[in-house]
């Protein structure tokens, strides 16, 4: 489809359908697989296989979006209208913030290694009903794991500001280039008929926008690459039981965005008094 900044067929419906199908698979297939894997009856091979399947589902999501990113779709991918108000605060360049991933991992470790006196009776009863490998998965993490988490977080602290800086520069350049092209085209055609003037200006703006759109596509793909690498690095750095627990927590968090009761409560709280 030819690129046009002012008139293009919105692909938001297509992305909405894709996201809904992906989320449904996450909730109805991935979560049950992981929970089955974390039961005492599951074998090591089942655990490993299901972790790989869920990881692939997450990675494939970003790969699909990367393939769909072009001049026409990038405005919708960076600012997805199909995301609800509960999801929006967690978005960074079109999808979940990479910091969320390591924060989730840290929360597992911190919760398990907090002072035992802080544990309530209900929590203790829950632990009794879980397989020993699950209850002890995050207890006293190895120095190697802690070091690897630090390295992942260090990489994010470098990459995230860099992506944000690229985004700001591209936006400034986009506004400057489009404004200049619009004014120049309008001055050239101001003695012509109004329709011809607008058409000439629109064409010039479209051409100017193409250049900046290419950089926006690159930024979006790089942001997805960071998200993918963080997820894969965490799974690679943890044991199979830890990886399964992390992916279960991540899937549960993402599935929670579709909880209609939670969404309704959030929207009520967001309303001005």
From Swiss-Prot:
- Report what the protein is called: Protein INAPERTURATE POLLEN1
Q: GO biological process annotations for this chain's record?
A: DNA-templated transcription; pollen exine formation
Top-level taxon of the source organism:
Eukaryota
Q: Which InterPro entries match?
A: Seed_Dev/Stress_Resp_Reg, TGA_domain
Cellular localization per UniProt:
Cytoplasm
Q: What does this protein do?
A: Required for the formation of pollen surface apertures, which arise by restriction of exine deposition at specific sites. The aperture length depends on the INP1 dosage. Does not play a role in specifying the number or position of apertures. Acts in a sporophytic manner.
Q: Which organism is it from?
A: Arabidopsis thaliana
* Record flagged with keyword Zinc-finger: no
**DOG1 domain location:** 12-267
Q: Which PROSITE patterns does the record cross-reference, listed alphabetically?
A: DOG1
Q: In which tissues is it expressed?
A: Expressed only in anthers and in pollen. Not detected in other flower tissues, stems, leaves and siliques.
Q: What is the lineage of its organism?
A: Eukaryota, Viridiplantae, Streptophyta, Embryophyta, Tracheophyta
């Amino acid at each position: 489809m030819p690129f046009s900044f002012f008139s293009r067929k919105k692909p938001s419906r297509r992305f909405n359908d894709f996201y809904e199908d992906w989320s449904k698979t996450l909730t109805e297939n991935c979560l049950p697989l992981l929970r089955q894997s974390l039961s005492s009856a599951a074998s090591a091979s089942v655990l490993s296989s299901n972790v790989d399947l869920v990881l692939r589902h997450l990675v494939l999501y970003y790969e699909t979006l990367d393939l769909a990113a072009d001049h026409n779709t990038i405005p919708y991918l960076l600012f997805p209208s199909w995301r609800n108000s509960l999801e929006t605060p967690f978005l960074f360049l079109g999808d979940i913030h990479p910091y969320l991933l390591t924060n989730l991992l840290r929360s597992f470790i911190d919760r398990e290694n907090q002072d035992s006196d802080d544990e309530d009776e209900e929590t203790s009863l829950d632990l009794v009903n879980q397989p020993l490998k699950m209850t002890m998965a995050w207890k006293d993490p190895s120095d190697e794991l802690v070091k690897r988490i630090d390295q992942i977080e260090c990489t994010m602290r470098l990459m995230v500001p860099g992506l944000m800086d690229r985004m700001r520069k591209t936006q400034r350049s986009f506004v400057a280039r489009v404004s200049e092209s619009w004014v120049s085209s309008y001055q050239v055609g101001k003695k012509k008929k109004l329709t011809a003037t607008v058409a000439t200006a629109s064409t010039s703006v479209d051409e100017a926008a193409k250049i900046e759109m290419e950089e926006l596509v690159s930024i979006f793909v790089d942001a997805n690459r960071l998200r993918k690498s963080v997820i894969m690095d965490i799974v690679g750095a943890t044991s199979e039981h830890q990886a399964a627990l992390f992916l279960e927590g991540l899937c549960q968090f993402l599935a929670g965005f579709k909880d209609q009761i939670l969404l309704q409560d959030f929207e009520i709280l967001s309303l001005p008094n």
